[in-house]
Amino acid sequence: MPPPSLQRRHILKIVVLTVFGTLLAWYLSAILSFAGNSYGFNNRFSEVAIQHHWWFLVWSNLVVLKGYLLVAAGYVLLIYPLVRLWGKVRAFARWGVVWRTLLFACLLYGFFIFKLMLEKPYFGDYSYLLGWYDALGRVCGTGVQDAVHAMITQVFPLTAIVCAAGFYLFELRRWFTRAARPLLFSFSAVAGILALFVVSGYGVNRVPDMEELAGGKKRPKNIVILGSDSLRADHLSCNGYHRLTSPNIDRIAAKGVNFERCLTPIASTLESLTSMFSSQYPHTHGVRHMFPSRAMVDRANQEAPSLGAELKRQGYDTAVIGDWCACGFNELPMGFEKIIVSDFDNFRVYMSEVVFLHHQILPLFFDNHVGHMLFPKLKSFANYMTPEVVTDQVIDRIKQRAGDRQPFLLFGYYSCTHLPYKTPTHYAKMWTDPKYDGPHKHELALNVDEFIGGTDINEKWSKLPRKEVEQITALYDGCVRMFDDSVGRVVAELEKQGLLDDTIILVTGDHGDDLFEPNCTFGHGTTFNGGDQANHVPAIFYVPGLEKPQRHAQLSRTLDFAPTLLDLVGVPAQPRFEGASLAPLIRGEKKSLGLAYFGETSYLFFRRTIPGEDPLFIPPMDETTFIDPDFDFHFVLKDKFQDAVLKTKEHCVRTERFKYIRTPGVNRSIERLFDLREDPHCERDMKTRYPEVKARLSAAMDEWLTTHKQSTTAEIYGILGEDTLQPTAP
């Protein structure tokens, strides 16, 4: 037998070579998969990527090597002591080290795969691996299943870490025993000085806790806005939904103000959020689709007013924190001073995500805080950024403001409820059928290439069986609960920091989502069919000092948020705001504002469905847009399609009872009128029964489009209201 020291070095060498060989095999496998285009662009943009950005694709594959090297180092640090400890029980030769190293590597890989299956099942089809776990729960009960879960996710890693730590502590003790005492003394002295520095708090910049500002003015209220992309108001339990999707939001509503019928003027994120924070309609601020040019963005930045800018002038700290759905704030900050969001709407980000998704080690080991620092691009990917990361950043910001007592406006924005409805397993399983085994098990299985390169996708999805619709809806509801948990964490932190009674909270969304209502399928912003679901968002306010909770069923708009919040903190509204303050309703000064809703659709990704009609349409996205290298490689609408996109827009005027829609057709304008009281899903056109209603709403729409004047319900119907207009004989 060789000397013990030689044996240790020999074992370490074999472990290192085996681990690095294993990781090299993983890397080469990912490269071959990428080269085979098993997951990539299969539309017109693929040609652009290969011909003009091949070097970027190569570089992206090289960048991930640092991840492989770190994983290899971690594997060696953990596996080496385990192999050594095994060797103390039974001696083995070179190949014994190799297969034991491979065994531990496989166990570690299996552990991380199991965690990935439970937390992010959408990263791959692991149903063949997860089947035994589901069967265990069905046969033995959830108690046994939970015990196995704890064994795998807690006991196994803890045992491995304790064994490795014990080994290294023993080795460290042996080293210190042989080391020179002066070295030990120096180390202790340095550690002591650092400890004293930390304990004393030397150098920490403290700000006095001030309840009042200079001049004796009372400190203004903070404002926290929490939103989720595609959050439907009618899927919150506080709004009567049949599932308990929003217990934390419900508690806010139970103490606050719930505007039950709040609508966004456009159901597309960039345009909607611009309208929300500028309090202007899209045809006023100029951002009317999701592929604006630099000139359009510059114009909006220069000319549009904003909630953030008004509050910043009052001394507020203003910040927006979000994941990939908040990427628009990079180009359109809307007055926010601190922008902590991902950069998603960028062709190079898309290409990077295609590359990174081939390398399994990234979701396995680096979808966390450390990984996001090592690979900043991960925060820009829809598959990687998690609500926990956004919430942690929001909480950190709240702690900072609690320390300096500066009033703040904070917008936390999440992608929780956005397509394709991906959640960790425990959310996905909340309301889905455990026996379901179709394509939408973990997410809405959307083929991105069909979405980008075709316009007839509605025809395919309109035939979806009822059980598939129920599965997708249940997945969406799990997403709502995931967002609700994030809201709960933020509110708890405000209370912990003593800020809750000094903070106005608004829970909302940028728009809703279609979930296969009549004459629509999925998505948002392409049609007013099916009802209000794509434009209807929560508007739940927590207002400190409110005497009793309120519910308002009358119409409100996201345009009204900015003037309302300014009113509540005592700041005058910007004269160019087009929204109205809802504060008079909250304070009980008025019973009604008589607001009417005016809206438009956004970019038309696929053809609309109007029975018996032929709506206007445009070519698919990969024909109408291009990648602008002078605008940070963003997707930009081609000049020749600017007018075409505007001409395909539907417009809508809605009052409490009636909804008038004007749709551009191939041969003529298509006008429809719906009585929402009798027909909430807009299936029966009533324009011939209510010709006067149709005429009045049509005139109000024309005036809004040409002069920007938005009529009130009294101006549209007269002082007696819409119910006085009688139908003609059938």
Residue ranges and their predicted role:
Residues 2-730:
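Catalytic domains that recognize anionic headgroups
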